[in-house]
């Protein structure tokens, strides 16, 4: 059983929602990435999404785009991202680790090579933003063979037939994008999200995590009440961007603590 599945099952028993923070590998520098990942875990992360820097991240808003740009300036690419994940795994064997990225860098190094590298780094799941389910069959099959979860995005505009198709391919969890725009966009309509999550669950037994637009503890708490996981990305990346170097770890720690307290309080 995958670490992702085990984590969600344990949290379900406790009536809790997973906190899933996102950071971009190599931002603000490669030397900071593993320390940041450890800080996330020490302050309540149930699993981590690690972004692969890419020059054209179409689903990402300005905050994460700039993080990608900074990482690329630091010469951090897909292989470096996997190496950083592997470094993290040297001291943390338990926390599920998910790579999030785009098809282009994966195809540039070759799918087989990518899967071989992430297996060696003990990656637990992959989100490939621009791999539609219709074209993902072989990729998903290869990941399944290595017991790596394939995580797909669903949006407010995803129709029921497509939800069914994605549900057949996906494993680990389903990632519901709460807004029609890019990451870090405007406010979430929590009632609409609740309705859509309920609809998704008609077609899949997988946990549903919600992301895009979770900007403060109040929103994190509201989202945790209606989902199995809360993805916090742009807000953390913004904290990294706006903090002086010596303040990054303390500020991320403080932010994580406030988000975790809010998420856990929803089950009280």
Range-by-range predicted roles:
Residues 30-40, 158-168, 210, 214-230:
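Catalytic cores of alpha/beta
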Residues 19-23, 48-50, 97-101, 126-128, ...:
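Hydrophobic faces of well-ordered beta-strands that scaffold small-molecule active sites
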Residues 45-56, 125-127, 176-184, 213-214, ...:
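Glycine-rich phosphate-binding active-site loops on the catalytic face of alpha/beta enzymes
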Residues 62-98, 141-155, 191-208, 251-268:
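Alpha-helix-loop-beta-strand connector modules within alpha/beta enzyme cores
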